[in-house]
Amino acid sequence: EGKIIPQIYHGRTRRERHEELIEYAVRGGIAQARIAHEMAGGKGRIHANILWEMGGAEHVIEGVLSGAKGLIHGVTCGAGMPYRLSEIAAQHGVYYYPIVSSARAFNALWKRSYSKASDMLGGVVYEDPWRAGGHNGLSNTENPLSPEEPYQRVAALRKLMRSFGLDHVPVIMAGGVWWLEEWQDWIDNPELGPIVFQFG
């Protein structure tokens, strides 16, 4: 259901059209947040999900968070190394949830910027490079043809998070989670700490 809104460009140059597209994305994000808020009757939490390497990502999320103030509670972000995510989220008083595929990636994010806004870190989403459809990366030291078990990678992530005082922050296992029975040994596991699952 719904009404298709045609995308009509008025700009003549590529730059002008790009700016129009960003504004269109901002308006769309605000509209979606309002619809979700109304459908939920103001109950529950609404999170935005953005691809960091998308053109104009920072402008889009800044615009959406400004225009939908109080409606969005968290921002999940991956597809790249979203260094500025913590700063943007903190400025708008929302939690941030970076998507990483290794402890190494989180270490870089933490040291460069996340440590400055640690109180707004709502969780760390782990998407396994071999199970999550291949849209997240491996480092040059990892072999794409030799899958590693996600348990050891998440345990390494948790160990690193503990060294930063983040034992209370949940890890969200995402990508390749279809049956909770396959993950029973992860639940209430002291090595992994607080963990939740995103199915799919």
Question: Could you say what each language-model-derived stretch is?
Answer:
Residues 1-164:
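Active-site entrance/lid segments in N-terminal catalytic domains of soluble metabolic enzymes
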